């Protein structure tokens, strides 16, 4: 079983998130993509984070199609950090080939995540191009530190079979939706 893990606060979820998940599903030849809705992103302010139930409902609207699963596993596990979640899931499901999925905007700030180097060594990582983030992502501390482990995009279909560290940067049609922009419009309107 090849499973993509797409974590985020999804505050709110939007078509750009769906684009990332669908791109990963197709290009990585995954059986499932699990959207891990974070109870609270430790790098973001809690006062602007919508309630978990509201964000879960929003993700369900966008996580359509076969193989898309919405999960509050981090809440149930009491896990606040991706590295802890990955370790628990890998221990519980040793036969599953997990891939961490993120947008390029997340790779640009990945070095701020707790245990980011361990994440890269725990599971293969797929980075999906996002508008305005390509240069920052490709020159980020994480991209530089793990340049030796970057695979060509033509090998994306076998990334799940790789031993970490291994990562791929996938380009293609871009989706310009943004949670930040959506929140800005909602506060103004």
Swiss-Prot record:
GO molecular function: ATP binding; nicotinate-nucleotide adenylyltransferase activity
Pfam families: CTP_transf_like
Gene3D superfamilies named among the record's database cross-references: HUPs
Pathway: Cofactor biosynthesis; NAD(+) biosynthesis; deamido-NAD(+) from nicotinate D-ribonucleotide: step 1/1
Stored SUPFAM superfamilies: Nucleotidylyl transferase
Catalysed reactions, as listed in the record: nicotinate beta-D-ribonucleotide + ATP + H(+) = deamido-NAD(+) + diphosphate
EC number: 2.7.7.18
Gene Ontology BP term (one): NAD biosynthetic process
Keywords recorded for this protein, A-Z: ATP-binding, NAD, Nucleotide-binding, Nucleotidyltransferase, Pyridine nucleotide biosynthesis, Transferase
CDD domains referenced in this protein's UniProt entry, alphabetically: NMNAT
Known function: Catalyzes the reversible adenylation of nicotinate mononucleotide (NaMN) to nicotinic acid adenine dinucleotide (NaAD).
Family the entry assigns: Belongs to the NadD family.
Protein name as catalogued: Probable nicotinate-nucleotide adenylyltransferase
Organism field: Caulobacter sp. (strain K31)
């Amino acid at each position: 079983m090849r499973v993509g893990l797409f974590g985020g606060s999804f505050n709110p979820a939007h078509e750009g998130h769906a684009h990332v998940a669908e791109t990963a599903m197709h290009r990585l030849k995954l059986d499932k993509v699990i959207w891990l809705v974070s109870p609270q992103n430790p790098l973001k302010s809690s006062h602007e984070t919508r309630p978990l139930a509201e964000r879960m409902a929003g993700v369900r609207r966008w996580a359509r199609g076969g193989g898309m699963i919405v999960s509050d596993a981090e809440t149930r596990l009491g896990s606040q950090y991706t590295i802890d979640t990955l370790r628990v899931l890998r221990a519980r499901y040793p036969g599953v080939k997990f891939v961490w999925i993120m947008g390029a905007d997340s790779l640009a700030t990945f070095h701020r995540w707790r245990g980011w180097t361990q994440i890269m060594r725990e599971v293969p990582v797929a980075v999906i191009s996002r508008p305005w983030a390509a240069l920052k992502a490709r020159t980020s501390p994480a991209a530089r530190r793990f340049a030796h482990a970057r695979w060509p995009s033509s090998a994306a279909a076998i990334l799940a079979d790789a031993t970490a560290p291994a990562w791929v940067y996938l380009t293609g049609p871009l989706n310009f939706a943004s949670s930040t922009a959506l929140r800005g419009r909602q506060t103004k309107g």
